[in-house]
Design a protein with these regions (language model features):
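A composition/biophysics-driven feature that prefers long, compositionally simple stretches
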Residues: 1-187
Length: 187
């Protein structure tokens, strides 16, 4: 908060130090500031379903509505750099301890215990760990931008396919990993 406090001095932006005493949560702030009939807009790709439902409840309480297909930053950040196209790379089982097939079997066991038909994976480290791959899409962590959906038979990986060489693609196919274009997760 120190840097933000310094950089916001003299602006009209008020720093809200979330988690500190007397500072409202985001939903409490919205609830107390939303006027009758107003709309709450957010990018539904980056808000959990629980948060989205909470915002919908708040909006309805104020006779308003939500708009979850809004990415205002995309509209104004015209020189935004493209997503990384750096290739993913394999990690040998001697470093990972288990094959992808073994990890998928372990996860499926946990899914059965939890009576889950589908497992949604959005954390990059979980995806990379499960698939024994790493990448260079972050300056600080060896991760690959991707999403995954897993069911009892398949593991659906949403990734820029250009990141995957033929060896990784063949290994994925053998392990039941189905590759989809990165942005298809939103379809």
């Amino acid at each position: 908060f120190l840097q933000a406090g310094e950089q916001l001095k003299g602006t009209t932006v008020e720093l809200m130090k979330m988690g500190e005493p007397g500072v409202p949560t985001l939903d409490a702030f919205i609830n107390s500031n939303l006027k009758k009939g107003e709309k709450i807009g957010f990018d539904g790709r980056v808000v959990s379903m629980d948060e989205g439902q909470l915002y919908d409840e708040i909006a309805k309480k104020h006779e308003g509505c939500i708009e979850y297909s809004v990415d205002l930053i995309d509209e104004i950040w015209t020189d935004r750099p493209p997503l990384s196209e750096k290739p993913a790379f394999d990690l040998d089982v001697k470093y990972t301890g288990k094959t992808v097939a073994e990890k998928l079997a372990d996860i499926r066991e946990k899914m059965v215990e939890a009576e889950a038909d589908m497992h949604v994976v959005t954390t990059l480290d979980d995806i990379c760990w499960t698939l024994n791959i790493r990448g260079d899409d972050s300056d600080f962590f060896p991760l690959v931008l991707s999403y995954a959906l897993m069911d009892e038979k398949s593991y659906h990986l949403y990734i820029d396919e250009r990141k995957l060489d033929d060896n990784i693609k063949a290994r994925f196919a053998a392990d039941g990993v189905v590759i989809h274009p990165y942005n298809d997760i939103y379809e």
